[in-house]
Amino acid sequence: MKQIEITVRLNEDKQTAMKKLSELGYKVIRQSDVDDIYMTTKLDELNADNIQYVLKKSILLRKLTVNNTEIKKITYKNKEIDSNGNVISEQKVNLNCEDIDKAKKLFSYVDFKELVRVKYHVTVYEKDGIELAFQDVENLGTLIEYENNDRVVKEENKIEEEKVSKIL
């Protein structure tokens, strides 16, 4: 499934932003804690000019905790990047994983090295099918992410096609 993703840094107090969403009718639908380990075979090639390339060649070991339930996954994200280096869409491949440490060890045997570890808390707000995720990232700050899945993209394309057919 292809997703359109927009992620921006929150430039105001988080509590103020969350209050604004609540006033607009958004409701908290879930919270989770995420511990991501990015691994790559391209670590030795990493420089300021090729970060997106190295990330595209990375796998992600993820431990997600939701409602005291742990979910462990191995993920590959195939990101589509524009000429400015912005991620404009991505397709994910997820596999369930019983043991993140063993998975990390397995990937190390085939020359994958840890690129970065990212830990964050997520609070997801929803209204009318629109979800906004506040991500409190350790040592980085708060980001807001919007993801539009393939179903919504198809619906938007259908609406555009209907508009065009009315004109023709």
Region spans (language model):
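N-terminal strand-loop-strand beta-hairpin
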Residues: 1-129
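Conserved, surface-exposed functional patches that form binding/active-site neighborhoods
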Residues: 110-154
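Hydrophobic, well-ordered secondary-structure segments
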Residues: 104, 143, 161-165
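Mixed-charge, glycine-accented linear interaction segment located at domain edges/termini
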Residues: 152-168
